[in-house]
Amino acid sequence: MLNPIVRKFQYGQHTVTLETGMMARQATAAVMVSMDDTAVFVTVVGQKKAKPGQDFFPLTVNYQERTYAAGRIPGSFFRREGRPSEGETLIARLIDRPIRPLFPEGFVNEVQVIATVVSVNPQVNPDIVAMIGASAALSLSGIPFNGPIGAARVGYINDQYVLNPTQDELKESKLDLVVAGTEAAVLMVESEAELLSEDQMLGAVVFGHEQQQVVIQNINELVKEAGKPRWDWQPEPVNEALNARVAALAEARLSDAYRITDKQERYAQVDVIKSETIATLLAEDETLDENELGEILHAIEKNVVRSRVLAGEPRIDGREKDMIRGLDVRTGVLPRTHGSALFTRGETQALVTATLGTARDAQVLDELMGERTDTFLFHYNFPPYSVGETGIVGSPKRREIGHGRLAKRGVLAVMPDMDKFPYTVRVVSEITESNGSSSMASVCGASLALMDAGVPIKAAVAGIAMGLVKEGDNYVVLSDILGDEDHLGDMDFKVAGSRDGISALQMDIKIEGITKEIMQVALNQAKGARLHILGVMEQAINAPRGDISEFAPRIHTIKINPDKIKDVIGKGGSVIRALTEETGTTIEIEDDGTVKIAATDGEKAKHAIRRIEEITAEIEVGRVYTGKVTRIVDFGAFVAIGGGKEGLVHISQIADKRVEKVTDYLLMGQEVPVKVLEVDRQGRIRLSIKEATEQSQPAAAPEAPAAEQGE
């Protein structure tokens, strides 16, 4: 019999329901989590035995949105969901990051978490719901997991923190921050902000962590009712004698190797030491496991680097804890791009470009919450050569998507509004060298490239990555971490912003016990580093260029009467198509009558504006126009007077004498002056050549142009 176990609780302004025991009973654990009609079904499956020779933890997190959740059918050719979207990939990473550190050291059994959005309230984002579901399912499963975790979104509206704001509230918020953690400590932060202070950001993290305790309490209560027995898993016993033998052979040599400041030289020396140590030990005892020896050597490496930092000694590359690596900043490095910059910090380098396009180049995103248009695109590429390796080059991986989104968040707060700068902007960061914090180098490079392109950003922005080494109560916060310090340390803490405040904060913590005080030290140290980098950047370019690149499209905006839009577009788009072909421009018309003309040549834009003004001009009775004969009939001729408007010249209005045959006076395509006699209620226009000729050239006969044309 199906016997669901349900817990319901209030979480901010929303009601959360946790339900288990009803569905997917063959999975290790399954939970349906709902928050005000947004429901996510989360399953966990764990393998009881690890694969032989497995030397890493194979955790997979899949997050998938089903369009039926929003009452829609997919718009793809096959009418079903396909590969994960960028948004789905980012939420999968959001779930993965806080749960991964909570599995015990040495646990290498395969675990898969699948979160499926099955119902959605447009006001409630499913990401927090999915994170709560993953935490609950893992806690129920019996898999060794040191959770549960809570998750919260924090907004900042009218100088007040708001817990789990709705989508409408987020539009008014100066902050969008997601925080996840255990009962005791924060594990992950992901945020974007409108240049808030360090204290405001830290306050949001603390607020979110305090508020999510109700989630943790309710998951614990659910586990008491429905949790499966904890797996009888024990880590492999430590071979103290082997550890001591490996340390005797390698520790001193590794300590010396980690004094080599050049990354490639250091890596080469470390590889030699590891290979020689393993070869020596296998020669002594061929029954030893090479993977186990590699793990022991890695632990020694970690200890060497960490103990040196905690003792106050210089870091791997000889710097003090708060020193920034050498900076090299250049702009305008690519001749035909709209904006470009090369930003180098130590052995991390980013070649960043900015490209300007029209509204037609904006990305239309068909999301579960509805369709939206994105006019600021940020793409991050991490080729294998950047770390001296070979590899597959193809579509972006999860890491590239995540780093690109973080860099975008760092820049978004200073981007101009579309009404002030009506361009779609694409920034691409090519990581050409990498040794720590390439995403923050991308933020710095993007700021420089945008200013080089003449984009009127509100302020320059820079980013910095901080690290942490902590043993007991002793800790050291490191500025501008290397790749090794990230890998061997306890925290990856990235901060981007301007001189006025923070635009993005991302934090991933690998240990428990990170206090508010440690985060405060990290934020303050990051501010000093950010201001230093901005100072160097400002020496290269301190304000956006006064004009955009000669190779960029120039957008000219004019306003027309909304009633005239149909005239500019024409039947089936015929007029606007002809206009774009005739003038060589791109023309976009909005419902309010705003017309945007984009062209790389100013004369072409002027021509297009002139033609649109002709089309939309009101026909004035009594005014003389130059028109072109488009049709000849027995009773007169139809003459186009611009703007797609056509009027009739009656046979009696062609000349000041009796006309027997229209073609004696007019030819197809002939240009003639015409005077507007009348515009009736149906918009029909009555014209006169006779009166126009009398008004401008009283002596000229109307048949003269025809005679000239016929010679």
Swiss-Prot record:
Positions of the S1 motif domain: 622-690
Entry GO terms, CC: cytosol
Catalytic reaction annotation: RNA(n+1) + phosphate = RNA(n) + a ribonucleoside 5'-diphosphate
Intracellular or extracellular location(s): Cytoplasm
UniProt feature, compositional bias: Low complexity: 694-711
KH domain mapped to chain residues: 553-612
Keywords (A to Z) from UniProt: Cytoplasm, Magnesium, Metal-binding, Nucleotidyltransferase, RNA-binding, Transferase
GO biological process annotation, one example: mRNA catabolic process
GO function terms (MF aspect): 3'-5'-RNA exonuclease activity; magnesium ion binding; polyribonucleotide nucleotidyltransferase activity; RNA binding
UniProt: Mg(2+) binding residues: D486, D492
Name of the molecule in the record: Polyribonucleotide nucleotidyltransferase
